[in-house]
Amino acid sequence: IQDEFLVQPASRAGLVNGAQRRLNEAIGWIGYTGAIVAREIMPGGQTGAYGHSVAAQGGHIQPGSYSGHFGDAQQARFIAETAILLFKNEAVEGDIVAQANIWAGYANRVLGENWCEAVIDGGPLEDGLVYLKRAEGQFSEAINRASTDSLRTAAYAGRPQVRAFL
């Protein structure tokens, strides 16, 4: 889909909702995998499709494993940040920009809390805290742009979580 179509009023919500969906996918898998490793849920033949390795069930995450979770979170970040950029270039106003910043902020927060290193859009390898710094700015932007209490509350909830981690 070409960018010119993504910024049309009828497409904006779909773009933002796409970021939300990918983030929901990432959070679900990160939570599930973390619960297995922490023994918050007990394995019961969960190997193979949608399962976890015996090593993970025993509490060990192999380096380089579970890249799908990372991919989901990166896609959420990329989609939301692309929306922010496209909306800025088209001078889109209103709560849709606040929503894009909220989902970008939460995607960056998830990345910063779960991965020690960061690569943003093919750039250099950086400290994972870069995700949290980006999230802080995105939450602040959402607070400034939001016209509803629910959006401001979502941004106000995310920003101190990021600041506490930093």
Model-derived regions, located:
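Conserved, well-structured interaction surfaces
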Residues: A13, A49-A118, D127, E141-D149
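N-terminal carbohydrate-binding/catalytic regions of secreted carbohydrate-active enzymes
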Residues: A26-H52, S65-F70
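Aromatic- and glycine-enriched pocket-lining scaffold segments that form the walls
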Residues: S150-L166
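Membrane-proximal, proline-rich intrinsically disordered regions
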Residues: I1-A38
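Flexible, glycine-rich active-site loops centered on histidine and acidic residues
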Residues: I120-G122
